[in-house]
């Protein structure tokens, strides 16, 4: 790793949808009923059969910045080209709406010496203080059990007070449980511009793939973009400093062939093309082939425990990268604890650089009888404009 913050900007799977039901998408279909018109009076014993009208609209979060990385306030429909499965779409609207930001704060980190509750609290308060006026915030902590410490509020001082008075240290935090609780909490926030700021190291043991997949499915229904600030790199560095006594002669590496068995099964239903893209991303390649930066301690049990922790943190880094990747967010890997305030500012700026673009898909889904995945591509048509958005979304047939 280099001596500066590692920040990976990610695309996303599962677009923010207005309407639909199913394991991956929230209601994409809005059904209205109207009376069946008739020129003859209807006998009292007969009821007119209602007609269902499905209104389909995709809400697509798009980040727009200029060549210097600053928010571009001049975005117009003619500046963008949206392709769905290669087919150009007609943009109906571009607007900015207040963000709903759920802080999901891991207060465990019992065996990660770099993970401090005070640092997490300061980071969260900094994010809240830097958000745009009108944004609303809620906060969940998980360090044993998942606990709501602040319900939705548009008053930053209220959220900051709750973070100061209620955030407390725990021992073990289970990320899948926290994701499930977050999806429930996000149902109370308006759709279109929902975010999760996840501060964690992934937990004390390797994240179970089945549990993570279940949590991800629920998050897809909540339409949330996840931004991860990970303590994994800081933790690995700190463990090596504490237990460096005899250098490792031959450091262990993860074979490249393990890419398939380690990464891809997290979401076995991912389309093949997407899986290939993710498999070859530089982040995952680095995480899976980088030598564990370890050292042998003279006390073998201590060394073995530290070695296991290094492996766990590194593996969790992979899952967290996937988590951000699948939801259109980013993962930030601070190298120094002193970087956290600036990272909080950058993250708040990222949240508030987002537009909500809407279009009606040319390939309707109201008559679909099975689940399908649609590929998305958002392209800038204007020189100097940089845009980023989700890469696909999953739709299912509407309930009859």
Roles of regions detected by a PLM:
Residues 1-6:
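N-terminal secretory signal peptides that target proteins for export/translocation
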Residues 7-10, 33-35:
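Intrinsic structural disorder/low-complexity segments
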Residues 24-400:
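Scaffold/interface architecture of coatomer-like assemblies
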């Amino acid at each position: 790793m280099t001596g500066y913050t590692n920040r990976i900007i990610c695309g996303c799977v599962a677009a923010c949808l207005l309407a639909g039901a199913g394991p991956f998408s929230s209601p994409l279909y809005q059904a209205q009923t109207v009376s069946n018109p008739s020129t003859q009076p209807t006998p009292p014993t007969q009821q007119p059969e209602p007609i269902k009208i499905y209104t389909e609209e995709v809400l697509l979060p798009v980040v727009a910045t200029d060549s210097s990385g600053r928010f571009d306030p001049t975005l117009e429909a003619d500046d963008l080209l949206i392709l769905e499965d290669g087919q150009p779409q007609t943009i109906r609207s571009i607007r900015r709406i207040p963000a709903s930001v759920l802080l999901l704060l891991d207060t465990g980190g019992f065996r990660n010496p770099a993970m401090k509750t005070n640092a997490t609290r300061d980071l969260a308060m900094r994010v809240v203080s830097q958000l745009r006026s009108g944004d609303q915030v809620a906060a969940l902590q998980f360090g044993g059990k998942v606990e709501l410490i602040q319900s939705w509020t548009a008053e930053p001082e209220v959220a900051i007070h709750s973070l100061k008075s209620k955030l407390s240290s725990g021992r073990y935090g289970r990320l899948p449980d926290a994701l499930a609780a977050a999806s429930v909490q996000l149902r109370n926030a308006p759709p279109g511009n929902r975010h999760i700021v996840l501060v964690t190291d992934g937990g004390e043991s390797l994240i179970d793939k089945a549990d993570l997949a279940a949590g991800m499915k629920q998050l897809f229904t909540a339409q949330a973009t996840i931004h991860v600030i990970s303590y994994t790199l800081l933790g690995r560095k700190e463990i090596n400093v504490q237990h460096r006594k005899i250098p490792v002669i031959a450091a262990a590496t993860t074979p490249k062939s393990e890419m398939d068995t380690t990464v891809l099964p997290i979401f076995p239903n991912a389309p093949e093309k997407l899986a290939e893209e993710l498999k070859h991303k530089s982040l995952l390649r680095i995480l899976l082939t980088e030598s564990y930066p370890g050292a042998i301690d003279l006390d073998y049990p201590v060394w073995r425990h530290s070695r296991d922790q290094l492996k766990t943190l590194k593996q969790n880094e992979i899952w967290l990268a996937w988590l951000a990747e699948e939801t259109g967010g980013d993962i930030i890997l601070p190298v120094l604890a002193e970087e956290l305030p600036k990272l909080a500012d950058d993250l708040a700026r990222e949240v508030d650089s987002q537009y909500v673009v809407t279009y009606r898909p040319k390939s309707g889904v109201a008559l679909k009888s099975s689940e399908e995945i649609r590929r998305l591509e958002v392209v800038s048509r204007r020189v100097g404009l940089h845009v980023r958005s989700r890469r696909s979304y999953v739709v299912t047939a509407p309930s009859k």
